[in-house]
From Swiss-Prot:
Keyword terms of this UniProt record: Ribonucleoprotein, Ribosomal protein
Record InterPro entries: Ribosomal_eL22, Ribosomal_eL22_sf
Protein name, UniProt field: Large ribosomal subunit protein eL22y
GO MF: mRNA binding; structural constituent of ribosome
Classification lineage: Eukaryota, Viridiplantae, Streptophyta, Embryophyta, Tracheophyta
Membership in a protein family: Belongs to the eukaryotic ribosomal protein eL22 family.
Source organism superkingdom: Eukaryota
Source organism (scientific name): Arabidopsis thaliana
Keyword Cytoplasm: no
GO CC terms of this entry: cytosolic large ribosomal subunit; nucleolus; plastid
Example GO BP: translation
């Protein structure tokens, strides 16, 4: 009997939240944060349908950060994949990369590739 009560208590879905920090490219005016937000709203699939976020997934924008909050399960790898796809579509994938900025891996950051290191290696 106690088993059923434990299952009912665990029935609550925990929400996950991921943040994409785009401050460096937005400050340099390489990309617009609004276009990334729109891209994510159109492309995130919920229940096999793209663009139908409903109440389960919400996307918010604050200055140069986008926060994706999901009520149920949401893959961090999927968010990284979509961000890379956006960068490729806007021809900035050669200069920017998506990396996890903290240990919990719920904060992604768009950073520039270190081109200075590559130029130093080519000179040798």
């Amino acid at each position: 009997m106690s088993r059923g009560n434990a299952a009912a208590a665990k029935g609550k879905k925990k929400g996950v939240s991921f943040t994409i920090d785009c401050s460096k490219p937005v400050d340099d005016k390489i990309m617009e944060i609004a276009s990334l937000e729109k891209f994510l709203q159109e492309r995130i699939k919920v229940g096999g349908k793209a663009g139908a976020l409903g109440d389960s997934v919400s996307i918010t924008r604050e200055k140069s950060k986008i926060t994706v909050t999901a009520d149920g399960q949401f893959s961090k790898r999927y968010l990284k994949y979509l961000t890379k796809k956006y960068l490729k579509k806007h021809n900035v994938r050669d200069w920017l990369r998506v990396i996890a900025a903290n240990k919990d891996r719920n904060l992604y950051e768009l950073r520039y590739f270190n081109i200075a290191e590559n130029e130093a290696e080519e000179e040798d």
